[in-house]
Amino acid sequence: MVMPLALLEKSMNKKISLLLKDNRVLEGKLTGYDEYMNMVLEETEERTAEQTRRLGVVVLRGNNVVSISPLN
């Protein structure tokens, strides 16, 4: 099993997908994080069942994240 902070370290400056507690999905380039898993994403898009929105730079509180997946 990969530890979350190790995955974030490997994913720096790469695209990731985040599933949030409210079932939204954010996809963007990880440009920063801290020990609480708060993250900074650039070129971020929010995906819901109905639509996709471009958000740009997002600062995300770590406790809102359910899962983290690297994108190729």
Which stretches of residues belong to each language-model region?
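Conserved RNA-binding domains used in RNP assembly and mRNA/RNA metabolism
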Residues: 1-72
